[in-house]
C-alpha cells in the first residue's frame, strides 16, 4: 500500500462511492474511510468542509473534491499515476 493523506467520505450502499473505493484499492492507495450514513455528525462535518452533503467526497492534503466520483478518480490518476 502507498501511504497517503486521503480521507474518503462515503456510504457503503453508494455505487459512486464503491467506484472510488475500487479505484483506490486498484491503485494500492492507503486511505481513511468516513461512513457518513452511519454517523449523522459526520454528515454535518461533511457540510462544513465541502459546503455540500453529497458523496463521495474526498480530501487529500489541501485538495478537496465534493460529490463527484469522476473528478475524484481523475485526480487520483493524475496525482498518483494510475
Model-based region annotation:
Residues 54-65:
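A short, hydrophobic beta-strand/beta-hairpin element that forms part of a small beta-sheet core
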Residues 47-54:
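Thiol/disulfide oxidoreductase modules built on the thioredoxin-like
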Residues 63-67, 72-76:
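C-terminal cap of thioredoxin/glutaredoxin-like
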Residues 78-82:
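Generic C-terminal helix-cap and adjacent flexible tail
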Residues 10, 30-42:
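Thiol-based oxidoreductase modules, predominantly thioredoxin-like and allied folds used
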Residues 15-18, 41, 67:
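Residues that form or flank phosphate/diphosphate-binding pockets in enzymes
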Residues 39-41, 45, 57-58:
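BRCT (BRCA1 C-terminal) domain core and associated BRCT-interaction motifs
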Residues 1-29:
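Local sequence-structure signature of Cys/Sec-based thiol-disulfide redox active-site neighborhoods
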Amino acid at each position: 500500500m502507498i501511504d497517503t493523506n486521503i480521507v474518503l467520505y462515503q456510504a457503503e450502499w453508494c455505487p459512486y462511492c464503491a467506484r472510488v473505493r475500487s479505484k483506490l484499492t486498484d491503485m494500492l492507495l492507503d486511505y481513511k474511510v468516513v461512513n457518513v450514513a452511519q454517523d449523522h455528525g459526520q454528515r454535518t462535518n461533511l457540510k462544513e468542509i465541502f459546503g455540500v452533503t453529497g458523496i463521495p467526497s474526498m480530501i487529500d492534503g489541501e485538495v478537496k473534491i465534493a460529490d463527484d466520483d469522476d473528478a475524484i478518480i481523475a485526480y487520483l490518476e493524475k496525482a498518483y499515476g494510475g
